[in-house]
Amino acid sequence: MIMKIFRKFAHRNLNYRRKMNKKRLLTICMFIATAGTLHAQSFETATQAVKNMGVGWNLGNTLDANNNNGNRQDLTSETCWGQPYTKPELMKMMKEAGFGAIRVPVTWFPHMDTSNKVDAAWMKRVHEVVDYVLDNGMYCILNVHHDTGDGNFHWLHASTKTYNNVKGKYEALWQQIAEEFKDYGEKLLFEAYNEMLDDDNCWNYPSWYSNKAYNATSAKDSYDAINKYAQSFVDVVRATGGNNTKRNLVVNTYAAACGGEWGNGHPNETLTELVIPTDTKAGSGHIAVEVHTYPGVTNMTNTKNEVNALFSRLKSKLTDAKGVPVIIGEWGTANNGETDYDVRHDNVIEFADYFVKKAKEYNCATFHWMGLTDGTNRSLPVFNQADLAETIVKAYHGNTGGFKYPTRDDITSEYEVTYNNQWSELNLIQGTISTSTYKGLELELAEAPAAKAFQFKVYPSEKTQDITAAKSTLTFTSAMGTSISRITMQSSQAGNKTTVKNVYLIKKDGTKQKTEVSAFWGCSVTENIITGIMPVTYTRSTDHHIYNLSGQRVTNPGKGIYIQNGKKFYRK
């Protein structure tokens, strides 16, 4: 009924509008005013958003990956830490598994010029990945990630001196991000910064390192800086207008630390000294605070006590004291020199179940860091820690049916490969592997190749071996080195074609790890998925921009009727 009235009100035939009697016009205006009020109130509070997120996951080591030296990079940075190019199918899998939110960490400085402008191609790629998340109906937290950290090239540090030096660059960055997404709805949140450290790169709290005495003056300066960054972030985002005037924003504590005692009260200062930014434009209720935690799980009694203390502390020192909801933006286990999931598997499952249930009890959203699906598993996509993913979801939602946790056992892919150039290459493995862990590689083709048609090529040694059968094995030798960065299937001539059925890395104990092929250079690859999550043809179904009734984009809409994503709404 309201849409019908909107159409009549938007009709541009002046003669028709003159004939409308005053009483009818008044009725329409009253309906529109009511609709406007409903629209203005529909942008949920941060507390509502955090509760509605359920359980989340981090798309880690992907858009946040960088060359660790501060130099400029192109779009290939997304895969430089060994993760594959992100596909929309991955987000579809996470949604179907029961996850309600994805944190998208992004490192920006390798993609900014000297005038602080973000490369257009990089912004477009970030935009695409954000859309993958939102198009699956999940919440998305977009942040500034390894621009913070403990390396010299990390330019955001928690000192007022650094803040004063980089304030212009920091605000320019957030102004561009905010402008890019200003028309997006309430399921997109911005996170101001990741784990920001002082000039001494101290984790947990300023002046933490034991080789230096605690310096209260230096610590206060760090907390003052954190609060200044947080306020700049809120002010810049709000000033861009559009939906950013009400968007829920996230600020982190110093180092995203979650407090604790440790024999002194200093860790808790990360919570108590955080000042929630003034948010005049949005009013109260649109800011959340984020912390990270990675407990040890060697002793489950101690672990559960630590978890209990954590959530009690977050409630008393943040939610109750400052009136803000809390997001656990990263959580996992300490992995004391090894992978807990492998060596303390039962403890990890028990911990995840307990942690998520406790977080739900305290109305905290949780975002598991990495794991669950990692490396080439993301491309298929499948879970390599399916039982952990299922534990996390069931801890929050209960034994609700309908969620899916595909593994490599559930998926079969074949790759049709056409070599367009002589000596062109297909990636069988990309990303560093150690010959102390793996002893070889197994390749299975649909049929045996012609003699001398193909060969294995190993990098960086560039050692080669002919592929002579439908199933061929490459045994790693000392001549190939202790570390292998890439293995390809090279064609001796242009025009060769083949179908790859399976590629496995063979571990020292004989177990196999399936991998995914991709084009290296001079060849084209078509993937045929026999089972599993079906491919998604990505088209941006919504552009989230706001238009007037004449179809013109409006960047700063005032009062009136507008169109967004094909629907009319009234902005009061």
What are these regions (language model features)?
Residues 6-9, 13-26:
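Bacterial N-terminal signal peptides that target proteins for export
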Residues 43-44, 50-261:
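Active-site mouth of glycoside hydrolases
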Residues 25-33:
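Sec-dependent N-terminal signal peptides
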Residues 411-485, 490-513:
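Extracellular ligand-binding interfaces
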